Amino acid sequence: EGALDILIPLFKNEKPVFLTWLPLSHSYEHAVQFVQISLGAKVYYAESLEKLLSNMSVAKPTIMTAVPRFYQNLYSKIYMNFSKQKGLKKKLISSTISLGIKKLNKSRLSLVENFINFFCEKLVRRKIRNQFGGELKAFVSGGGALDQKIGEFLNSIGLPTLQGYGLTEASPVVSCNIPGKIKIETVGPPFKTNQVKIAEDGEILVKGENIMLGYWNKKKETDEVIKDGWLHTGDIGEITKEGNLKITDRKKEIIVNLGGDNISPSKIENLLCLSEKIKQSFIYGDKKTYLVALIVSESNENKKEIEIYLEGLNK
């Protein structure tokens, strides 16, 4: 019901077209199927991840749902292509990104900026949208934290990207950004079917008809996470003055170093993975005086480039 409240105004009298590639057994994708049925949507299933872009030109999706890793890869590929451009084309791309982020943040554009943005729309954003079928109205990210820089970048180049939040125990969506009111640093307002509050220690608590009855044959584990009807998510967050939910950390993943400092590994891991040369990263440093990063590179040939990137981050 909460998802329908967001999507119905977006499509009005049109029937949405989905292109999906996530496993149908995944709780996120499983919930999306119910949304598709409720909307009477046309659904295309991608042949494979490798053929996703070519499938987009055939399906011409108006909406796609995916996990953050997909958007991270998309960002890396587009950014790599942009970085190869020179001269006027490079300046136009730079203006597209900066003015797009300004519009995303509801900042007023000057007369000159509006003039430049007109050409950015025609010469850059429209071409990018056409590569994705030309009809895309929303990417929806869920199943993990989407890096703010990636969200801003995709929105700025004409690919509207909404970040949502949920967990399997909440069937599985709790909140999502609203088209036209995107606050990319948040996961949007909670659905009206949910009650959300922040505990004294900062943990996000959720209550509603979408909360699970419990873990199958595991009463002890159930009682640990559901107390007085409130699901203890294990995530740390806050509610902004606009009423949006903002995730700041994962309760059990906080690193406490030898000096007693609390460090969020996910923020550092996301920063590392912004490099197109880094496939995955893992940060460790509990009860240590230092942090260690375990990095999976795209290929062994990228070692020197990764070292240069890390040196830049450490400055």
Task: Indicate where each model-derived feature is located.
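Conserved AMP-binding/adenylation subdomain of ANL enzymes
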Residues: 1-20, 24-125
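Phosphate-coordination loops involved in phosphoryl transfer and adenosine-cofactor binding
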Residues: 15, 136, 201, 228
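Thr-Gly-centered strand-to-loop micro-motif
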Residues: 21, 46, 141, 163, ...
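Active-site glycine-centered loops adjacent to acidic/histidine catalytic or metal-binding residues
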Residues: 23, 143, 166, 188, ...
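Gly/Ser/Thr-rich phosphate-binding loop
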Residues: 62-65, 77-182, 279
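Conserved ANL (AMP-binding/adenylate-forming) active-site segment centered on the GW(Y/F)…HTG consensus within
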Residues: 111, 115, 181-184, 211-234, ...
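Conserved ATP/PPi-binding loop(s) of AMP-dependent carboxylate-activating enzymes
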Residues: 159-160, 183-192, 199-225, 244, ...
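AMP-binding/adenylate-forming catalytic core of the ANL superfamily
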Residues: 198, 208, 213-214, 236-315
